[in-house]
UniProtKB/Swiss-Prot annotation:
PANTHER family: NEPRILYSIN-LIKE 4 (PTHR11733:SF237), ZINC METALLOPROTEASE FAMILY M13 NEPRILYSIN-RELATED (PTHR11733). Zinc metalloprotease. The active site is at 455, 517 (proton donor). Belongs to the peptidase M13 family. GO terms for molecular function: metal ion binding; metalloendopeptidase activity; metallopeptidase activity. InterPro entries: MetalloPept_cat_dom_sf, Peptidase_M13, Peptidase_M13_C, Peptidase_M13_dom_2, Peptidase_M13_N. Zn(2+) binds at residues 454, 458, 513. Induction: Expressed in the late phase of the viral replicative cycle (between 6 and 9 hpi). This is Zinc metalloproteinase R519.
Length: 615
């Protein structure tokens, strides 16, 4: 019997298939999210919700439908910014969930003490990436957007501090300078870069200007508390910006921050699509808004419908089987005892939260809703901000994910947190399309198993390596083992770069995801093999064995296939994501008869050998 040299799913997404764009295909995970979104939207727009919390959501919904252009609350905020001390205005915006010169979140401290502390996050650019600020046409579109914003806020929000040209110039100057110090995608994922901390008193000595930080954060921190920050360059830039920039110029940027926060809910929406890659529509805004502000309620509704105890138990067992396989592999490998100990402890201490995460808000303080939509939003933002602020100085709970909002179980997004060494598999992914207790295990390992294994292997990807078993940052492996492991990971990246026609920037952006895709596929397949109890060699597999194991790869491709890749996705394009990891799995060659003349062949010397059989 002749076996095909490629995966058995019509080869629609194969990078070696010239017809890969001939047909459309549906991404299962996107389909799941689309179905959930439709159900949640139908629930939100239903007239018959009769519980107390749901009624608040309905009042909020109706205020959205009837939102005014001339909201009194905006005129008050604008007047405050125009007439008050700049630092007071920044604090007011922060307390009401509006990012201006920085954002503030609460996050686990990455070193001793293991407590929650505030994290200062540099502002998000208006354009999609820092590279866009080198594009003349993109800058023209941004200037036009700022101009439209000025026209809107002078007409409806009673803004009158500055003329139009000065407003545009001040905002463009801040945006352009900010683009120079904004982190790259690779840096944003690197623990060495984004996890920095100082004691509060030390932070003030280094970065405070004219009591800026002390007046804004001082009421929340004691001198021995820590401040975490993601971008040292930005803090240095901000220090100079505050020293040398006129207060009116700063105020112009604060007003623009209001536009960035609320413009999506106004007539400015049509102009947003001039400065973003992915078009924004009213349906997205509507559902994202309710997820953000009423996610705690919608999650309860969702869990009531879709919580599946048996599937959770199945995945939990799969998780421990994968951890056992992974641990045994590294115990048997040729690393030093020091490295083996570090890896073993990290795997042992790897935890999973499945279904919904356990952080609960104090709903007794949840605000009542009124008729003014924008006032409702500010009340909600203030509520969530102060709920998170209460955690400062408290001990880390590894099962809490959404202390800054988000990470709800109805969002199709598995996640690994390197600082707590814990992964999250939401209820949304525990779907009949990814796991069925009625079908052969091989399909489940090819689908939900690869998702789970992908997140597990983030703990040992290029960034996960930087966090040790004690959750400190800075790899503690034996140096020779560390270099050997990294050299093997580079094989995955070099392969990815080749498939991207040597577009190195594109590959670097997806670097950790490519590693976790490849090693996750290996881990799931080899864990399944340990249950299947067969050694994969060309001469000891029957035809039935091959047909059976091919189901794993069929399930893998059915889960991730998608031609129309999202430009904002951190992962590789789907036609690469599906196929590239297979080239590093020797068993794939045996099962499909892949030989050197085939385009999906990779020389054995160029394949990653992590998780391969130890001779």
């Amino acid at each position: 019997m002749t076996y095909r040299s490629c995966i058995p799913q019509n080869d629609l997404e194969c990078y070696y298939n010239p017809n890969k764009t001939k047909y459309k295909s549906t991404n299962i995970l996107s389909s799941i999210q689309h179905k959930i979104d439709k159900e949640l939207t139908a629930y939100i727009t239903d007239k018959t919700i009769d519980d107390t919390f749901g009624n608040r959501m309905i009042v909020f919904r109706d205020s959205f439908y009837d939102k005014p252009k001339n909201s009194k609350i905006f005129r008050q905020i604008i007047h405050m910014i125009e007439t008050s001390n700049c630092w007071y205005s920044v604090k007011f915006l922060m307390d009401n969930g509006i990012s201006s010169l920085f954002s503030l979140g609460i996050t686990p401290h990455h070193t001793y003490p293991k407590k929650y502390y505030p994290m200062i996050i540099s502002p998000i650019l208006s354009l999609e990436s820092k590279n866009d600020y080198q594009d003349y046409l993109a800058l023209v579109r941004l200037k036009n957007f700022i101009g439209y914003s000025y026209d809107y806020i002078t007409k409806y929000w009673n803004y009158k501090l500055s003329n139009k040209q000065n407003f545009i110039n001040d905002v463009m100057e801040m945006e352009s300078q900010l683009s120079l110090v904004t982190l790259t995608i690779e840096q944003q994922n690197n623990p060495f870069v984004i996890y920095n901390s100082l004691k509060w008193r030390e932070f003030l000595e280094k970065y405070d200007v004219d009591n800026f930080w002390s007046s804004i954060l001082g009421s929340y921190l004691k001198k021995e508390d820590y401040v975490i920050f993601d971008n040292i360059q930005y803090l240095s830039y901000l220090r100079e910006y505050l020293k040398n920039t006129s207060k009116n110029s700063i105020k112009n940027y604060l007003v623009y921050s209001l536009v960035k926060k609320f413009g999506l809910y106004t007539d400015l929406l049509e102009f947003y699509n001039d400065i973003v890659i992915e078009s924004i529509n009213h349906d997205q805004i509507f559902l994202n808004m309710f997820s953000q502000y009423f996610g705690i309620y919608l999650e309860t509704v969702f869990e009531t419908r879709y919580h599946d105890k048996d599937k959770k138990e199945y995945i939990t067992k799969m998780f421990y089987d994968m951890k056992l396989y992974l641990r045994n592999y590294f115990i048997e490998c040729k690393f030093t005892d020091k490295t083996k100990r570090e890896i073993s402890l990290k795997i042992d201490n790897l935890h999973m939260v499945i279904g919904r995460q356990n952080y609960q808000y104090d709903l007794e303080n949840f605000p009542l809703m009124g008729n003014d939509f924008y006032e409702n939003v500010l009340n909600l933002e203030r509520y969530y901000f102060h709920e998170s602020i209460k955690l400062i100085g408290s001990t880390i709970n590894k099962e809490w994910f959404s202390i800054n909002g988000g990470m709800y179980s109805f969002e199709v997004n598995a996640y690994y947190d390197p600082i707590c060494n814990v992964l999250y598999i939401p209820t949304s992914i525990i779907n009949d399309m990814t796991i069925s207790l009625e079908r052969d295990d091989v399909y489940n390992y090819g689908s939900i198993g690869t998702i789970l294994a992908h997140e597990i292997m983030h703990s040992l990807d290029n960034f996960g390596l930087q966090v040790n078993c004690d959750l400190s940052i800075g790899n503690k492996w034996d140096i020779s083992d560390y270099k050997f492991y990294l050299s093997d990971l580079r094989k995955i990246i070099q392969h990815r770069i080749k498939l991207s026609n040597y577009d190195i920037a594109s590959s670097i952006d997806a670097l950790s995801e490519d590693i976790s895709d490849t090693l996750g596929l290996k881990l799931s397949f080899k864990t399944y093999l340990s249950k299947f109890n067969k050694k994969i060699e060309p001469d000891n597999l029957s035809t039935n064995d091959k047909i059976h194991l091919q189901k794993f790869f069929y399930s893998w491709t059915e889960t991730f296939k998608n031609i129309n890749n999202n430009n904002q996705d951190d992962h590789s394009p789907s036609y690469i994501r599906i196929n590239a990891p297979l080239a590093h799995l020797d068993e794939f060659y045996y099962l499909y008869g892949v030989e050197s003349q085939h385009l999906n062949y990779l020389d054995p010397q160029l394949r990653s050998r992590i998780l391969d059989k130890i001779n």
